[in-house]
Amino acid sequence: MTDYSNSPDLKGSVLGQSTEYIDQYTPSLLFPIARKLNRDALNIDEAALPFKGQDIWTGYELSWLNAKGKPQVAIAVFTFACQSSHLVESKSFKLYLNSFNQTRFNSRDEVKQHLVKDLTAVVNSLVQVTLYNADEYNCLPYTPLPGECIDDLDIEIDNYDIDAHSLKSQSNKTVTETLHSHLLKSNCLITSQPDWASVIIRYTGEQICRESLLRYLISFRTHNEFHEQCVERIYSDLSTQLSIKNLEVYARYTRRGGLDINPYRSTHNNDTPFAVKINRQ
């Protein structure tokens, strides 16, 4: 497996570094990371992506001052197309949002315009931004994940190194089913801090051996990679190792630094059809 944690493209990242918290609007704090780094390791051609999808970020700690100096707060939902050339490094995103804290803006719409402009410039693709007042944000209450949970399978685990070849078919019978697990854990590519997630897998194809799928997902437990990259790896491995016609992979990660990241990849949908929010978020 290719290790790109020491790539020159990651130099300058604030992850793992002591940083100064700036409270005046500073868009230059945003640090882009090329999606190509991970995709090259997976033999994914960026000119002909094998999937569609989006990365949905929720920002719970956005605040600024109005024209009179009175603090305003909002919850922000940011949607990045997976076709964008770059993603935003999460700590730089947090620092960027903090830079709004003591900056005066004339309106919430002006804040949104800055967010859209800055993020779009960093990832080279239009970013959708929706701002909610604190009392408005109830559009995603906790809902049970769709499909069957595979976490209660009684299996023995003795390997925590990702092995795509461990994925097996249960039978040649073609099925359409939705499975989910709350046992996905990966680690930050730079800092090795743990990242926790629940993952939904919906597919049409030869029936997946659930024991092999659970072992595979658990094998991410010691793996260092960004959230979006883990989901693309899961999608790629399932597509490569199994006879699957339609596939959707959606992970809901718990928040860190006031942000949660929720990547979705699909053979056929640009937007996730799963309106879910896990209770750990």
Swiss-Prot record:
GO terms for biological process: queuosine biosynthetic process; tRNA modification. GO terms for cellular component: cytoplasm. The keyword NAD does not apply. Substrate binds at residues 88-90, 227-228. InterPro entries: GTP-CH-I_C/QueF (IPR043133), NADPH_dep_7-cyano-7-deazaG_red (IPR050084), QueF (IPR029500), QueF_N (IPR029139), QueF_type2 (IPR016428). One of its GO terms (molecular function) is preQ1 synthase activity. Its EC number is 1.7.1.13. It is an enzyme of class 1 (oxidoreductase). It catalyses: 7-aminomethyl-7-carbaguanine + 2 NADP(+) = 7-cyano-7-deazaguanine + 2 NADPH + 3 H(+). It is found in: Cytoplasm. Keywords: Cytoplasm, NADP, Oxidoreductase, Queuosine biosynthesis. NADPH binds at residues 90-91, 256-257. The active site is at residues 188, 195. It comes from the Bacteria. Pathway: tRNA modification; tRNA-queuosine biosynthesis. It holds the Pfam family QueF. Homodimer. Belongs to the GTP cyclohydrolase I family. QueF type 2 subfamily. HAMAP family: QueF_type2. Catalyzes the NADPH-dependent reduction of 7-cyano-7-deazaguanine (preQ0) to 7-aminomethyl-7-deazaguanine (preQ1). This is NADPH-dependent 7-cyano-7-deazaguanine reductase. The gene is queF.
